[in-house]
Design a protein with these regions (language model features):
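N-terminal beta1-alpha1 ligand-phosphate binding loop
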Residues: 25-45
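A short beta-strand-loop structural module common to alpha/beta enzyme folds
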Residues: 48-56
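Anionic-ligand binding patches
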Residues: 25-28, 64-226
């Protein structure tokens, strides 16, 4: 499916990009998530966002890590196929979670959200945040999967119900919003990138975009830099 791309899993590999492409290239986020859009804005690079319309159902036997990686690639690839120019750089991202080796799906409703959070009490949950960058200028696909471990507090059922009613995290992996009140459910977080749990690993992404010529600290690519 991805044979037309040269695939890299090394964040520091610099690709040879013609200088004029830096001006013509357009950055596209393959997501309709308002949270991912806000996080990407932190890098200061102009971008557009488009709906990849990807089915996020897990395949039989698929682990959380493989699910997140596949969906991140599928989202970026779907937008890449729709574009009518070879100057675009496309970002796809996805997140999946597991507890005791079992995949935690997006709860979808209040009952499932409460059941998931009750199961997480006092335990360590693994979150896998995948990010994929497809550079149509060079035909390259770069990808990373960040592993974040979250140790949950042990709270009363009434507290969990109150949280769910306040934030309604029905479409979130694990049944909480780490960018909001969900942080109050945690005892500790272990990760190499604190932004990964929020849905977009900005440390890896900034480094990768810099490696392909889209540097947040360069005036040519970031209008906010003087």
């Amino acid at each position: 499916m991805y044979d037309r791309y040269k695939t890299f899993f090394c964040q520091n590999q610099r690709l040879r990009i013609p200088k004029d492409y830096l001006v013509m290239s357009q950055l596209i986020l393959a997501s309709t998530s308002p949270y991912r859009r806000e996080f990407l804005k932190r890098l200061g690079l102009p971008f557009d966002s488009k709906d990849p319309q990807v089915d996020e159902i897990a395949q039989a036997g698929e682990t959380a890590s493989k699910l997140a990686g596949r969906l991140a690639r599928d989202k970026a690839d779907r937008i890449a196929k729709k574009t009518n120019t070879t100057h675009n750089v496309i970002i796809g991202a996805d997140q999946a979670a597991s507890i005791d080796g079992k995949l935690l799906r997006k709860p979808g409703n209040r009952h499932n959200a409460l059941r998931q959070l009750m199961a997480c009490q006092g335990k360590t949950v693994s979150f896998y945040t995948a990010c994929c960058v497809i550079d149509l200028r060079s035909g390259s696909l770069l990808q990373n999967i960040d592993h974040t471990q979250v140790q949950f507090l042990t709270l009363h059922k009434e507290q969990l119900e109150r949280y769910i009613d306040l934030e309604k995290p029905f479409n979130c992996a694990g049944g909480f919003k780490a960018e909001g009140l969900g942080i109050s459910l945690f005892k500790s977080i272990t990760s190499t990138d604190p932004t990964a749990l929020l849905g977009l690993p900005l440390i890896w992404l900034a480094s990768t975009l810099r490696a392909i010529g889209l540097d947040s600290l360069e005036p040519k690519t970031n209008p906010g830099v003087r």
